[in-house]
Design a protein with these regions (language model features):
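Alpha-helical transmembrane segments and their immediate juxtamembrane interface regions
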Residues: 139-179
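The transition from N-terminal targeting/processing segments to the mature protein
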Residues: 45-49, 91-97, 128-132, 207
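Membrane-water interface of transmembrane alpha-helices
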Residues: 77-98, 162
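N-terminal, intrinsically disordered, low-complexity segments
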Residues: 1-31, 185-212
Length: 212
């Protein structure tokens, strides 16, 4: 879907996905950040479960040291994420404007992108944990991933609520831009785009969530 900005609003033009391949896309801010928070939290909980299983099986783990690593990683990720989230949200709200000419990601493309992103993250962490089990007898990597993932995930889910609240206050829909071939939204500051809420009857049925 192509969104053409016209002043404070926008015109939605449906085009073939092949014609839009390789172009930047815009995605709903609250939905995208919430999904990222869910993936990071799930990744952290999966790593924590992996460590607990190793501990129950009397594998190569050090509960005391791993607990310290987990707590430090959780605290660091939470504090750093809170500062980054605050700056990211503030910057986006200051730069909020209607989109000029951008691709609105379709539901099918969004589903495919998110599946690939989650698969790559879980596969990468899984390989890292297996290697850590072979070369280490502490289990610190699993604790580190668990703490960082849970902390960052909580921050993202809290930020998603702020995006939803901002949409309600402004009676609009707020979007973030995904670069070509990007699997997740940028963690740093980026511009945001705004479209007014339209009537539900005007929403294209194949693209739910664009105008509600």
């Amino acid at each position: 879907m192509l969104v053409l900005g016209t002043g404070s609003g926008g015109i939605v033009v449906t085009m073939a996905d092949a014609a839009l391949a390789g172009l930047p896309r815009i995605v709903r801010a609250d939905d995208e950040i919430r999904w990222r928070g869910q993936v990071l939290t799930s990744l952290g909980l999966a790593s924590l479960s992996y460590w607990i299983i190793l501990w129950l099986l009397e594998g190569p783990v050090d509960p005391v040291f791993a607990g310290i690593v987990f707590g430090a990683a959780l605290l660091f990720a939470f504090v750093l994420g809170a500062v980054t989230s605050r700056r990211r949200f503030a910057h986006a709200m200051l730069t909020l404007r209607p989109p000029r000419s951008m691709v609105h990601e379709t539901v099918a493309n969004s589903r495919d992108r998110r599946v690939r992103a989650a698969a790559m993250m879980f596969l990468g962490v899984g390989i890292l944990l297996l290697l850590d089990t072979v070369v280490s007898d502490v289990g610190a990597t699993a604790a580190l991933v668990a703490g960082a993932g849970i902390g960052a995930g909580i921050i993202d889910r809290l930020e998603a609520r702020r995006w939803a609240q901002a949409e309600d206050e402004r009676e609009s829909r707020i979007f973030l831009m995904l670069r070509p071939n990007a699997l997740i939204a940028r963690m740093g500051a980026q511009d945001a785009y705004e479209l007014p809420r339209g009537r539900r009857d005007d929403e294209p049925p194949e693209f739910p969530g664009t105008y509600l």
